[in-house]
Amino acid sequence: MKRYLLILILTLAFFTLKAQNKNIYMSSGGEIILSGADVNFNGVDVNTNMRFTIFLHVQQQINFNFTDNLGLYTGLSIRNVGLIMEDYYQNVGYDVDNTDINYNKNTKIKHRSYALGFPLAIKVGSFDDNFFAYGGVEYEWMFHYKQKKFIDGDKYKFTAWNSDRVNTWIPSWFVGLQFPGGFNLKFKYYMNDFLNKDFVGQDFGEDVDYSQFESTGIWYISLSVMLKWKTIKREIDENFDNKVAYR
């Protein structure tokens, strides 16, 4: 229901702006993401590592400027999000006791998913100077999952489309600043857990019950460059003209 309401609002906003001949433009960019996580398993605060990712992060935005100082944007994004746990074997998700051969062994587990996002944000600032603050919400579909395990110097991994191990749809809120030149600094917080507490099964042949995860919340800080399509086109045309002239 919420998704249908969002689509309706965006459709109405689009046609209202078209009718009023306001400024509408497209922009594109990527992201460099540094993320962290808050993980608790069976009452234990699990040690987590910071996660640095560059690939694959793509953002396409439709910008609606009501005035020179107030507007909004929506669009689509694809990004790589997840968490890294590094702790004793019994603390990273496995349903084992002290008789297990791996008990008390240092183990690293990486959970990640590619996410398709649908953002909606308000922006306030000086659009003529390309300098503004923004804040909003995003709904992300976790469509491709990967898990890696590192133990005793060995690495194991598997992937799955639409895995039940992560929540399918995760909402988030974010705030950020765009600076002249298109540089962006953003903070995002995911409002739901990353892992699905209803999942019961096996990971790498070991029994797991994700209901034992009391929390698997993630957040991130990102740097990006967002450029208007007309700016990108101008750069391409200028580079092409320079190459032709050089020949």
Describe each model-derived feature in a short phrase.
Residues 20-62, 224-230, 234-236, 243-247:
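Short glycine/proline- and aromatic-enriched beta-strand/turn motifs that initiate or cap beta-hairpins
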Residues 20-28, 68-72, 129-133, 171-173, ...:
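Outer-envelope beta-barrel architecture signal
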Residues 36-52, 81-113, 142-174, 195-201, ...:
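Extracellular/periplasm-exposed beta-strand and loop segments of Gram-negative cell-envelope proteins
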Residues 161-247:
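Predominantly the C-terminal beta-signal and adjacent terminal strand-loop region
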